[in-house]
Regions:
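Oligomerization/assembly interface segments of phage tail-like spikes and tubes
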Residues: 1, 58-80, 197-218
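Polar/acidic, low-complexity leader/linker segments enriched in S/T/G and N/D
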Residues: 1-45
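Surface-exposed ligand/attachment interfaces on beta-rich extracellular proteins
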Residues: 11-14, 18-26, 53-58, 115-126
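N-terminal ordered "arm"
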Residues: 27-74
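Short, hydrophobic/aromatic-enriched beta-strand segments in well-ordered soluble domains
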Residues: 74, 177-185
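Short, conserved charged micro-motifs
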Residues: 79-88
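Extended beta-strand solenoid/passenger and fiber regions
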Residues: 87-160, 183-218
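A surface-exposed beta-strand-loop module
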Residues: 156-177
Length: 218
């Protein structure tokens, strides 16, 4: 069975010319009709805290940006000819070999950026990492769909979209040029468990438990 990616409706017209970055060969976790709207999502950081006898602390932050942990709930999963969602779900889990391989996930509530800053030209730098912003906080994005890149509000000159969300300009943007982009992005993820169970409730309907996974770095 093919694994069909969820593409935001506004992006459908751009599919024929879409460019993926850092996503070659990776399956996309599909959206299932029986998927519960209740989704758990949490940023996770890595911090070492050493407390002395006096109560003072020394804290060390090891990550420059968080990993995101997700948990999806499936209320009903169909398992019948023409609507075998259970087979599709097991397929992506087995293709990923549980925790081993990566896949892509789109969060319908957090998959689009508009005029996001990702750097300022200095006249010599050609390579820039695309980012997305949460208020004043910015973090890199690695799997990008059909980005529109601007230099100080005007269409950017020649560039290539490299793996892991990097933009490489043919000519370095001039000093002071503001670089922005708009488009869609996916989270690169892996499953948090090596087992995926489901419970049969009728002849052709199954109930799934939670599906847990975390974003990863390339």
């Amino acid at each position: 069975l093919p694994i069909t990616p969820f593409i935001p409706p506004a992006a459908v017209s751009a599919l024929p010319t879409g460019i993926w970055s850092g996503a070659a060969g990776l399956p996309v976790l599909p959206f299932m009709p029986g998927q519960s709207p209740a989704v758990t999502k949490a940023p996770k950081w890595s911090t070492e805290v050493v407390r002395t006898a006096s109560g003072r602390e020394r804290r060390t932050a090891y990550w420059p940006s968080p990993l995101w942990q997700f948990e999806l709930q499936y209320e009903v999963i169909r398992h019948r000819p023409g609507a075998d969602e259970l087979a599709i779900l097991w397929e992506i889990f087995n293709v990923s070999q549980g925790q081993y391989s990566a896949f892509l996930f789109v969060d319908p509530t957090d998959c689009q950026v508009a005029s996001a800053a990702f750097g300022t030209g200095d006249g010599s730098t050609k390579t820039f990492q695309l980012q997305r912003q949460l208020g004043s906080f910015a973090e890199p994005v690695y799997a990008v769909f059909d980005p529109t890149v601007l230099e100080s509000g005007s269409p950017a000159g020649a560039y290539t979209l490299e793996p892991n969300g990097q933009i490489v300009f043919a000519a370095a943007p001039a000093e002071g040029v503001a670089l922005t982009w708009s488009g869609y992005f996916y989270f690169g993820c892996r499953f948090l468990e090596d087992e995926l169970s489901a419970e049969q409730i009728t002849a052709q309907l199954w109930a799934g438990k939670s599906l847990k996974f975390t974003s990863i770095r390339p």
